[in-house]
Amino acid sequence: MNKQDFYFDLPSELIAQYPLANRSDSRLLIYNRQTEEYGHYQFREIADFLQPGDLLVMNDSKVIPARLYGHKATGGKVELLVERITGDFTFLAHIKASKSLKSNDLIYLDAGKRLEVLERQDDLFLCKASENILDLLNDLGHIPLPPYIAREDESLDKERYQTVYAKCAGSVAAPTAGLHFDDAVLSSIRARGVNIAYVTLHVGAGTFRPVRCERIQDHKMHSEWFTVSPDLCAAVKAAKSMGNRVIAVGTTALRSLESAAMGGELIPCSRDTDIFIYPGYQFKVCDGLITNFHLPESTLVMLVSAFIGHQECMALYQEAIDKRYRFFSYGDASLLL
């Protein structure tokens, strides 16, 4: 298939620039693969469409304030986006500067803090901080909003560009399907008899990388670290043995589960994955998916297309556009069953 097969015309005013006042105020478009029927609801109603014994798998990765601003000794401005923390003091980052940096160069930040460039690794730079990097980011870092949100980060983003159940620091982009869940929704889901389990996948900046190949099969996915625990594997096995559904909350949770089951059986693991899911992929674990509405020609639209069918995906997105759903990270959600 070609990249153009996944194009749709999205009015710019449907790209959400801010979150709604309340997380669960977002709209929910439900699509049933068996009946091919749509339903339009509020996200706070989602428990009504889940069944006792269903297993929701959520990504508990926490967004770090990964964007830093500094300057070189010459005064030239430097902007960093931390891609991956590799140690207490070391990390890999994308760096923007007027002139490319090299080993041993220093980057000066506010409050007397500084970074040292250790080496270049392909498109990234391995750097060392003058103190614990997570502490430094919490002091000076900015929330790294996606490129399609055309504004600077604000104080509200520290709370709202984060799921309420985020626990494991490491993502530079939010697992956005989880942004709709608040405590009341989670309580209603548990009261319904639905089980919840967690996976961790640290979302990298590569999630926004466009597909540049005409043939989608030629696209090379970015790599992200994930972990699937023995407890999660046991929960999935228990749900499947009872004939219950495993529903991924977000494409990151889905990609983690499918990566851990590449041999045909879900096994505990902690490693990198660059799994690329597009039409023709045979799903091994997931029976349902909760996800936002994604960019035209993106790998995430290709994943949705693989899950519900290509024509069905394009029709679903046209339905969302016609009904004025909000798109992308701060937008509305879909439940695909």
Curated annotation (Swiss-Prot):
Entry EC number(s): 2.4.99.17
Domain of life of the organism encoding this protein: Bacteria
Enzyme class: transferase
GO MF assignments: S-adenosylmethionine:tRNA ribosyltransferase-isomerase activity
Involved pathway(s): tRNA modification; tRNA-queuosine biosynthesis
Catalysed transformations (reactions): 7-aminomethyl-7-carbaguanosine(34) in tRNA + S-adenosyl-L-methionine = epoxyqueuosine(34) in tRNA + adenine + L-methionine + 2 H(+)
Keywords: Cytoplasm, Queuosine biosynthesis, S-adenosyl-L-methionine, Transferase
Subcellular location as annotated: Cytoplasm
InterPro entries xref list: QueA, QueA_dom1, QueA_dom2, QueA_sf
GO cellular component terms given for this protein: cytoplasm
Keyword Transferase attributed: yes
Swiss-Prot/TrEMBL GO biological process terms: queuosine biosynthetic process; tRNA wobble guanine modification
PANTHER family: S-ADENOSYLMETHIONINE:TRNA RIBOSYLTRANSFERASE-ISOMERASE
Cited function: Transfers and isomerizes the ribose moiety from AdoMet to the 7-aminomethyl group of 7-deazaguanine (preQ1-tRNA) to give epoxyqueuosine (oQ-tRNA).
HAMAP family assigned to the protein according to its UniProt record, in alphabetical order: QueA
Family label: Belongs to the QueA family.
Subunit-structure text: Monomer.
Protein name, per record: S-adenosylmethionine:tRNA ribosyltransferase-isomerase
Species of the source: Legionella pneumophila (strain Paris)
Gene: queA
